[in-house]
């Protein structure tokens, strides 16, 4: 098994860490859930704008027009899918005053997992192709993806557990979203392999960077504010950026990233 594929699998498997955190002890509060969403948004924004997009633009054979064009394509592609797909948000599962029916819980969990899986799938491809092109950069991106997959797993498992009271169900739905990322890496390994040119790798990174920025600004940050109106989600965003920035500095200082 190749190192890039192993990195992709480990990054996707980090979702289970968040899932276990979401079901251990007491059910997570709205404040914790909102903070985790802001934290994930901060990591996504920093890694997209400070690592993925610059790396894509600096790739051999990549022109600024193509690089920024693919980034904008990722932005517009996300907003297009966001408008077409039905929405199901974590706070829909956090209603404590009404006991939802099992069918409605299942439907909401499916839609929520689908949305995150659509985001995770291209991340898996991007992690694999980036690590195939540059193992050091791929390691940094895999680390970033793994870090934001932890609160992402919490964001899925926490509300599902709060609504159903079933730890197994919560971990299952969170795990599915993480498996989508692994699937993206496996498909890239099977179909693309070593045939990917640096330009194609860079284009994929630029597209995914656009998707991650759009997801952070349009979904995660507003959702965090809606779940916990009494607290500013910017604190979570700043913490996420700080943790990610500090980890990247450590990697670069150690000569890894």
Swiss-Prot record:
Q: Which residues bind Fe(2+)?
A: 120, 123, 149, 152, 181
**Keyword Membrane part of the UniProt annotation:** yes
Per the UniProt record, which residue ranges are transmembrane?
5-25, 32-52, 61-81, 137-157, 171-191, 195-215, 236-256
| InterPro entries per the UniProt record, alphabetical | ZIP, Zn_transptr_ZupT
Name of a matching Pfam family: Zip
Q: How does it sit in the membrane?
A: Multi-pass membrane protein
Write one Gene Ontology MF term: zinc ion transmembrane transporter activity
Query: Where along this sequence does the record place binding of Zn(2+)?
Result: 123, 148, 152
Q: What are the subcellular locations of this protein? A: Cell inner membrane
Similarity-based family: Belongs to the ZIP transporter (TC 2.A.5) family. ZupT subfamily.
PANTHER family on file: ZINC TRANSPORTER ZUPT (PTHR11040:SF205), ZINC/IRON TRANSPORTER (PTHR11040)
Q: What is this protein called?
A: Zinc transporter ZupT
Q: Which gene encodes it?
A: zupT
């Amino acid at each position: 098994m190749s190192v890039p594929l192993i990195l992709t699998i480990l990054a996707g498997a980090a979702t289970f860490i968040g899932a276990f955190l979401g079901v251990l002890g007491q059910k997570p509060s709205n404040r914790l859930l909102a903070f985790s969403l802001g934290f994930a948004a901060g990591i996504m924004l920093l890694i997209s704008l400070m690592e993925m997009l610059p790396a894509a633009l600096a790739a051999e054979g990549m022109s600024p027009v193509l690089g920024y064009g693919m980034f904008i394509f990722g932005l517009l592609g996300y907003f297009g899918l966001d408008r077409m797909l039905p929405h199901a948000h974590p706070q829909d599962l956090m209603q404590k005053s009404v006991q939802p029916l099992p069918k409605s819980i299942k439907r909401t969990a499916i839609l929520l997992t689908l949305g995150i899986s659509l985001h995770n799938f291209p991340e898996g491809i991007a992690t694999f192709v980036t690590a195939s092109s540059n193992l050091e950069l791929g390691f940094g991106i895999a680390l970033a993806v793994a870090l934001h997959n932890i609160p992402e797993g919490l964001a899925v498992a926490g509300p599902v557990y709060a609504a159903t009271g079933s730890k197994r169900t919560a971990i299952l739905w969170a795990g599915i979203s993480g498996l989508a990322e692994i699937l993206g890496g496996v498909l890239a390994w099977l179909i693309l392999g070593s045939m990917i040119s640096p330009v194609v790798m860079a284009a994929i990174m630029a597209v995914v960077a656009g998707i991650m920025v759009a997801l952070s600004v349009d979904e995660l940050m507003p959702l965090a504010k809606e779940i916990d109106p009494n607290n500013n989600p910017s604190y979570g965003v700043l913490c996420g950026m700080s943790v990610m920035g500090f980890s990247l500095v450590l990697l670069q200082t150690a000569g890894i990233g």
